[in-house]
């Protein structure tokens, strides 16, 4: 697999590739497809803020002054206590939104909140020691100016009580301030108190009230988002944090981290549910075919139909040749339960079952079968290679290399071994070592096309452009009917922004696919051409049409599905794009792939909901591609 990318110009190319690790194959392609245009939704979960208007210059009432003096005397009892009090300058600063509490800080504060909650537990919210200064009756007789003046002073007392962690008193002060004036700041500050004692339902009520008065109040959005998350209402939390970020002008990096965390939590929840309800299934036929094509065809073993294991395996091989992979898998599993004419035939059964498990995303399950195959026939190299790929899938590089070394000690003449070892080195960025192994593979069998193609790609990655071009020109002469040669060569030309030549090669690859592959056609030349015309001519309509052709050729091609979603998103067709992202999640092999797909689906869903709920923000959304 090439997966050529150019870090300097930010462009990348998707290739169909043939890689020993199927998961790595999918992950690398998905990474590109999604990065051509991630949905621009960013947000943050806000922390606790204290807001402060300018201190009123008027004279305080005697009764209020007595309570304020009492609060101030507590502040002055000691330097340590004074340090806890929230200063007016800090309150004013927090109003600007610069004191955004990060997700990490929120997590760290969670433990403190539990302690604080214990302290307040004995004293209910209504058990404050605050006298009722502002009541519904008393404020009726006040002028507008008097109510505003009293509200501001009550808020000041609330801020001080909050700073001293006297949350019941702070709630009472803010409640009385609200009695004087329905100011969104008072509701948001009271919500901060409820958050401190863990009453998240009340946080949502107060912040919702604040937002009904001021829909662009960022701190209220942040507080409500945090409360929603605490209650497990992740979709609502994601919406609030997204809107908050847009109002805040995407200025804070923690907002991006927060929305990513929320997206991941939502995606993990949905992935977990889908994995529980979805029965194990094989990936698309083209996916399986691509993997199988990365190995030389093995000669069939000599079957003895007197043994039921042999007979079932013979049928499994017949289905395999026809591309009827589910039937082949079923027969292979049936074969495992039977008797065999020889350990060698039995080894082939385990190898085939392990292969189907591996391409289905069950790397750990496949290891049992591959190990069984090796134990039954230690000279059979293919299960060694596939076992190493399973370890690579599980990020166990130490065991992967041990298996590859064991295979080499058994047989130094197996071309597949060096090809797949080269692939491991290639994806690790060890291009010089990969080139050496590709050359070993070619020296052992120069008829295997993928060793030649990948050699050319590896040479290109080391900036040996002339050598790479020569390798591909030689490939075109030696394998004139191979669509893969023209597809990969087109990718390299596209990476050099030689658009016209790249498209010509993709077109030739498409024609060869139509002519040579009547049953399972590769969609990759069509997808690559779509990317080319988009980069070259910005022709989004043609790019979409090419993706639709790719899906017609291979309806379950995950790369085509993800590409289609992105091109639709680019055109503002978010609802249709969402359908493709969700389909991508349904087709995902592994949980990590599923989480990735659901993350983009949820980002798109949030964008749709946001444009409906906050139409005034549509113009402030970043271009999705």
Swiss-Prot record:
Q: What are the Basic and acidic residues biased-composition ranges?
A: 66-97
Explain the consequences of disrupting this gene.
Abnormal mitophagy during nitrogen starvation.
Give the stretches traversing the membrane. 32-51
- Residues bearing the modification Phosphoserine: 128-129
The TPR repeat units are at 151-183, 184-217, 219-251, 347-380, 415-448, 450-482, 483-516, 524-557, 558-591
What coarse category fits the chief subcellular location reported for this protein? Answer: mitochondrion
Mention one GO biological process in which this protein takes part, according to its record: protein insertion into mitochondrial inner membrane
Q: Where is this region: Disordered?
A: 56-97
Question: SMART domains per the record?
Answer: TPR
Q: Which residues lie on this side of the membrane: Cytoplasmic?
A: 52-625
Which compartment or compartments is the protein found in?
Mitochondrion outer membrane
Gene Ontology CC annotations of this record? mitochondrial outer membrane; mitochondrial outer membrane translocase complex; mitochondrion
Keywords per UniProt: Membrane, Mitochondrion, Mitochondrion outer membrane, Phosphoprotein, Repeat, TPR repeat, Transmembrane, Transmembrane helix
Regarding the membrane, this protein is recorded as: Single-pass membrane protein
* Function per UniProt: Component of the TOM (translocase of outer membrane) receptor complex responsible for the recognition and translocation of cytosolically synthesized mitochondrial preproteins. Together with tom20 and tom22 functions as the transit peptide receptor at the surface of the mitochondrion outer membrane and facilitates the movement of preproteins into the tom40 translocation pore.
Q: What family does this chain come from, according to its entry?
A: Belongs to the Tom70 family.
Its protein name is: Probable mitochondrial import receptor subunit tom70
Organism, by scientific name, is Schizosaccharomyces pombe (strain 972 / ATCC 24843) (Fission yeast)
Lineage, highest ranks first: Eukaryota, Fungi, Dikarya, Ascomycota, Taphrinomycotina
The gene name reads: tom70
